[in-house]
């Protein structure tokens, strides 16, 4: 570990002491009854977060994406969250039939750390980079997210009732002064 900075060592020691995020499975059969619900106040019983994080070749292993927020993710003139191509592709494949994003993108619900629903748009840029836009700025402000110190854990799933693609994002703040190396992030978070 000769090429690791003191900041990275400190961050790794803090990150490795964290418990794994809690995942929950919904194994109950859906009932055929029609019921109305308020999309703004959806409880976790209405969300289906089971095999959405699995890839076909890794059945049983839940998937999440963890990212350190960068300057461009919170910058006033940009305000979009860039997501990794491969992890998002694996999660989309695991969700089965996928909607076409088209040039306008796909409207998605993003549930924040407090369970609040934020409307955003998932787009794929020209080089294939997935981004969350149109609402990301408010999300950043709502949770007072900052570059480098905030790390996001992102889950992707289908809503149990609407079957629409949704995201759940949790944030954890660490005493980090700069960007951690990709190698350290991959080791700590074990991104797919």
From Swiss-Prot:
One of its GO terms (molecular function) is DNA binding. GO terms for cellular component: nucleus. It is found in: Nucleus. Keywords: DNA-binding, Nucleus, Transcription, Transcription regulation. The keyword Protein biosynthesis does not apply. The keyword Transcription applies. This is Putative B3 domain-containing protein At4g03160. It comes from Arabidopsis thaliana (Mouse-ear cress). The lineage of its organism: Eukaryota, Viridiplantae, Streptophyta, Embryophyta, Tracheophyta.
């Amino acid at each position: 570990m000769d090429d690791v900075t003191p900041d990275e060592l400190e961050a790794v020691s803090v990150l490795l002491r964290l418990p794994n995020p809690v995942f929950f499975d919904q194994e109950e059969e859906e009932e055929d009854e029609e019921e109305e619900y308020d999309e703004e106040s959806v409880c976790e019983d209405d969300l289906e977060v089971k095999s959405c994080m699995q890839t076909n070749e890794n059945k049983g292993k839940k998937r999440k994406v963890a990212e350190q927020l960068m300057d461009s993710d919170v910058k006033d003139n940009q305000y979009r969250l860039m997501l990794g191509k491969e992890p998002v592709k694996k999660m989309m494949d695991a969700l089965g039939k996928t909607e076409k994003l088209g040039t306008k993108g796909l409207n998605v619900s993003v549930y924040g750390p407090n369970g609040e629903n934020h409307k955003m748009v998932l787009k794929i840029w020209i080089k294939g980079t997935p981004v969350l836009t149109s609402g990301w700025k408010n999300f950043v402000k709502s949770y007072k997210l900052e570059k480098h110190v905030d790390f996001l854990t992102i889950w992707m799933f289908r809503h149990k009732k609407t079957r629409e693609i949704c995201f759940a994002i949790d944030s954890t703040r660490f005493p980090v002064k700069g960007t951690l190396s990709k190698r350290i992030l991959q080791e700590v978070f074990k991104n797919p």
